[in-house]
């Protein structure tokens, strides 16, 4: 994004928090690379628009971003760098953390997406499109939607930037909000420990994305993609009627989900995807594949352990992480899946473009498509940084506990986007920064 230079001066006489300069994902892009091809030719620059890459052979990789430019020094010596591994049982419950909402609610936005070379393509709202994040008491109401982008990894299973208890998902979506430059920061009533003074320029909502095959329909053809990208979707509401059920993919007590007697992620579903009880059903005895939970915090064997995070014995209780009240249900994001499939496959996004030669693809989307249903928006929050240079430490992270599922085709299409001049795609190096080792306090909105 664009932002005010937040001075974070270290022992060296160097202020390394730059938020007012321009960079991908977080800054409005002017110049992304010194030569437009994605190559950093000179190291130890002072420019904040110096190029960076996930490929160490043409530009220092994530572990050495701080050596590219003095402006990037926070990437190496910062105290609140992101992403992090979130340890769920160490996170502190804060009773007054607000619900995550948006204003206006379920607003469909006109966005433009382009090829961003070795970065994740991002969906940026067109001028005049306004959407604000609502986190009453935690931040003021002036954080405006800046973009949606999705990170992937070098492997299909490890693509998220954050992890929970050491576990990753294939992708992670980021909804980036930036404080409106036209307004002053208003004091908030809920403080996160007060370890870091000043204000956060950004609120970034992180969503763990899983992938699946069932229930997403056939791959859309080019003609169908034209309608999808303009915001026209079939009438099958994501929270309405499901594939084979009376009450939809996410129906609380739907009679028939994808393969079971009750909804795909039904709170009391008898049959989830392949198990005796819902995939993440609040009272489901079994996770992904029968007796074995998906990611049991205290499960005997993790992915295939006896007790999944939302299985019989979650982190602290018999039902879900802390019992029925705060269990999860994986939303199957059908509309978002088809939008991402069509966008990533389109030549304007898929093919490598030099700076100045980008072609924007118009896409209509609702950012809330990427989020769990409102009643399942339990989250972890902490004060961190941008995950790309300059790694500015001015971000309030809101990382969703509950996952969202998209089609496997989305992952395939994203990994096949060309990120380099020679045609190398994003599958080779990924677009994720490794988790950082610094100690930050993480809070959570659920017990």
Curated annotation (Swiss-Prot):
Coiled coil: none
Cleavable signal peptide: 1-17
Predominant localisation class: secreted
The protein's Enzyme Commission number: 4.2.1.1
GO CC annotations on file: cytoplasm; extracellular region
Cofactor(s) named in the record: Zn(2+)
InterPro entries associated with the record: Alpha_CA_prokaryot-like, CA_dom, CA_dom_sf, Carbonic_anhydrase_a-class, Collagen
Segments of this protein annotated with the region Disordered: 218-329
Stretches with biased composition (Low complexity): 237-321
Protein location: Secreted, Extracellular space, Extracellular matrix
Reactions catalysed: hydrogencarbonate + H(+) = CO2 + H2O
Tissue expression notes: Expressed at whole regions of the mantle epithelium tissue. Is found in the aragonitic nacreous and calcitic prismatic and foliated layers.
Family: Belongs to the alpha-carbonic anhydrase family.
Function (record text): Acts as a negative regulator for calcification in the shells of mollusks. May function both as a calcium concentrator and as a carbonic anhydrase required for production of carbonate ions, which are assembled to CaCO(3) at mineralization sites. Is important for shell formation in both the calcitic prismatic layer and the aragonitic nacreous layer.
Subunit field text: Homooligomer; disulfide-linked. May also be disulfide-linked to insoluble organic matrix.
UniProt name for this protein: Nacrein
Species name: Pinctada fucata (Akoya pearl oyster)
